């Protein structure tokens, strides 16, 4: 951080606004928004960061800021600045091309075309189709059924398409404008999903052709009917109300975000758009930036409704999109948003799985890690993590990676037995003693490397038990996290030292996966244990609430907190009699009355080791 930046940091206001980071050439490399400019901009130059943020900060030599009246103004300004300057570190959509649409032109003799430009020219537009191949497939089918004009300028004689029955040859055609408008309406109905009439017409024509012994023409009609059927199967029915809507869902993990947009037209999912990119700020804020870019830079018609996840600022989206914005609580629309979120998670998991499944990279990472630590190649790595909240239900977990891949059959869970209160060192001592005491007693194969989730204190505890008490010779390393609970540095050696390990390396990525998996496994076990203990104790003694109903409540609401927040009606919906539901509310809310009959549904999407903001 240079002196110029230090001086400017002291002048930052606490107002909302936008900040602009520049490199040594004065080029804008990142634009961001903040509710509090002072806190946000200073955060870049304090503490440690993940790899991608460190890369950004290393290039910043100057910054500017613009104060706005509100957060929404800051959001709109940020989108405009990104659009104008195209900073390399900002969220950018896949390309600057617009999505293709199928268009019926507003001409005396209309044409059916593919276009990426939506204009107010009286034409009928259908789409968007992120997959241009799908748009072309539909157009080819329509060309075979409806003989629209193909030529931009009237030819002097009939064209090739006239001879194959795909053009009316309007220069010699005797049909009036009403005929073509009627045909345009049929296409419109077809693209809106009302294709039964067209199929009936084709079936009638096929029957007439067969009776007239025109078998080739009958076969052509048959093929068209089959093609429409195939197209139907590709367009899944998602909603019964036949509305046009865009459905947004997103998922974040390991500094990456995936946003999926489902295009639902006339109740059918016709296409989806998928984007994966690194994010630098709060995921909710970066998602809003994405939505703004999506509707400003992707030239397509805004639908009747836009569905967004629960945690997103509805008013901010309304400022970006001139449409009805909904955050569905339940039912069909809620399922659509959940489906978009699920697909975003799957896409992001696939991205990381592809990296994990790269055998050469993983094997190379293991070998390089061994060379870096000056130990034999650590084929088997065992890693430990503790979990407790204020000392309650303390647990520990061990995960095992063999050849760089999780060996889940070897995972182990430990309830802490000898420690009272939140003592991480004592818990680590107990678990290490139990695990490797058993390895020694039963002559089990020891690991090639032990990785402890923690710093110098935890690693030294493990060394005392393994080397001094048990007399085992097993290398032990520590993975220390930063204040954001992200893998930060590797500790190893005697005495312990920070290992010079690039955060962009496959070795670091492997260790990060191991640490994340140990944390996920430990916290999952802890939550299960804590939930079981709390759930059983607080719901015991309620007449009419047996084990089966308790299980159903837990399965539906996921946690005791959610049951406590639920209304009586919502509890009844799970199959609990009203009198019992009222008793549950009285037991869980002893200082007040049962919650209102209609309450807002809340869903917690936070999962172990990941940030999943719907």
Swiss-Prot record:
Keywords: Cytoplasm, DNA damage, DNA excision, DNA repair, Excision nuclease, SOS response. Residues 196-231 form the UVR domain. Gene3D superfamilies: 5' to 3' exonuclease, C-terminal subdomain (1.10.150.20), GIY-YIG endonuclease (3.40.1440.10), UVR domain (4.10.860.10), UvrC, RNAse H endonuclease domain (3.30.420.340). One of its GO terms (molecular function) is DNA binding. It is found in: Cytoplasm. Its main location: cytoplasm. Residues 595-614 are annotated as: Disordered. GO terms for cellular component: cytoplasm; excinuclease repair complex. CDD domains: GIY-YIG_UvrC_Cho. Residues 14-91 form the GIY-YIG domain. InterPro entries: GIY-YIG_endonuc, GIY-YIG_endonuc_sf, GIY-YIG_UvrC_Cho, RuvA_2-like, UVR_dom, UVR_dom_sf, UvrABC_protein_C, UvrC. GO terms for biological process: nucleotide-excision repair; SOS response. The keyword Cytoplasm applies. It comes from the Bacteria. Interacts with UvrB in an incision complex. The UvrABC repair system catalyzes the recognition and processing of DNA lesions. UvrC both incises the 5' and 3' sides of the lesion. The N-terminal half is responsible for the 3' incision and the C-terminal half is responsible for the 5' incision. Belongs to the UvrC family. PANTHER family: UVRABC SYSTEM PROTEIN C, UVRC/OXIDOREDUCTASE. This is UvrABC system protein C. It comes from Streptococcus pneumoniae (strain 70585). The gene is uvrC.
């Amino acid at each position: 951080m240079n002196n110029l930046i230090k001086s400017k940091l002291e002048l930052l206001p606490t107002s909302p606004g936008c900040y602009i980071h520049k490199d040594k050439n004065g080029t804008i490399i990142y634009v961001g928004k903040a509710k509090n400019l002072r806190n946000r901009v200073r955060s870049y130059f304090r503490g440690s960061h993940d790899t991608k943020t460190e890369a950004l900060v290393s290039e910043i030599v100057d910054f500017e800021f613009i104060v706005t009246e509100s957060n929404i103004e800051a959001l709109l300004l940020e989108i405009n600045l990104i659009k104008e300057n195209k900073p390399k570190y900002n969220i950018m959509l896949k390309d600057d091309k617009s999505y293709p649409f199928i268009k019926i032109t507003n001409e005396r003799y209309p044409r059916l075309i593919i276009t990426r430009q939506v204009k107010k020219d009286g034409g009928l537009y259908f789409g968007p189709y992120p997959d241009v191949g799908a748009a072309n497939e539909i157009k080819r089918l329509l060309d075979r059924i409806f003989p629209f004009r193909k030529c931009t300028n009237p030819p002097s004689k009939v064209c090739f398409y006239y001879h194959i029955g795909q053009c009316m040859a309007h220069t010699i055609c005797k049909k009036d404008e009403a005929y073509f408008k009627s045909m345009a309406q049929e296409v419109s109905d077809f693209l809106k999903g009302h294709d039964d009439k067209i199929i009936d017409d084709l079936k009638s024509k096929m029957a007439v052709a067969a009776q007239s012994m025109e078998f080739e023409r009958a076969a052509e009609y048959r093929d068209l009917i089959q093609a429409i059927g195939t197209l139907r199967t590709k367009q899944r029915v998602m909603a019964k109300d036949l509305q046009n809507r865009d459905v947004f869902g997103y998922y974040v993990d390991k500094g990456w975000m995936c946003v999926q947009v489902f295009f639902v037209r006339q109740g059918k999912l016709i296409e989806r758009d998928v984007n994966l990119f690194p994010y630098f700020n709060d995921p909710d804020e970066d998602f809003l930036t994405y939505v703004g870019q999506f509707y400003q830079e992707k030239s397509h018609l805004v639908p009747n409704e836009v569905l967004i996840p629960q945690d997103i600022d509805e008013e901010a989206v309304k400022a970006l999109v001139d449409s009805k914005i909904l955050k569905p609580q339940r039912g069909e629309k809620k399922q659509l948003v959940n489906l978009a979120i699920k697909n975003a998670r799957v896409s992001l998991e696939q991205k990381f799985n592809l990296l994990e499944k790269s055998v050469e990279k993983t094997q190379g990472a293991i070998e390089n890690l061994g060379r870096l630590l000056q130990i034999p190649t650590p084929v088997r790595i065992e890693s430990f993590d503790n979990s407790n909240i204020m000392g309650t239900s303390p647990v520990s977990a061990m995960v095992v990676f063999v050849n760089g891949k999780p060996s889940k059959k070897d995972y182990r869970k430990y309830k802490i037995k000898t420690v009272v209160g939140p003592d991480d060192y004592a818990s680590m001592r107990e678990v290490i003693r139990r695990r490797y005491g058993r390895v020694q007693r039963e002559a089990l194969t020891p690991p090639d490397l032990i990785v402890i989730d923690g710093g110098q204190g935890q690693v030294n505890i493990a060394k005392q038990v393994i080397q001094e008490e048990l007399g085992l010779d097993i290398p032990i390393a520590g993975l220390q996290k930063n204040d954001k609970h992200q893998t930060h540095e590797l500790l190893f050696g005697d005495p312990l030292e920070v290992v010079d390990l690039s955060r962009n390396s496959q070795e670091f990525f492997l260790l990060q996966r191991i640490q994340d998996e140990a944390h996920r496994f430990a916290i999952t076990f802890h939550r299960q244990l804590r939930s079981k203990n709390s759930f059983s104790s607080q719901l015991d003694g309620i007449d009419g609430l047996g084990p089966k109903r308790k299980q159903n409540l837990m399965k539906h609401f996921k946690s005791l907190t959610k049951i406590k927040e639920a209304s009586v009606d919502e509890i009844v919906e799970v199959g609990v009699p009203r009198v019992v539901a009222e008793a549950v509310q009285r037991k869980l809310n002893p200082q007040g009355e049962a919650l209102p009959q209609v309450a807002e549904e809340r869903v917690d999407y936070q999962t172990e080791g990941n940030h999943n903001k719907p």
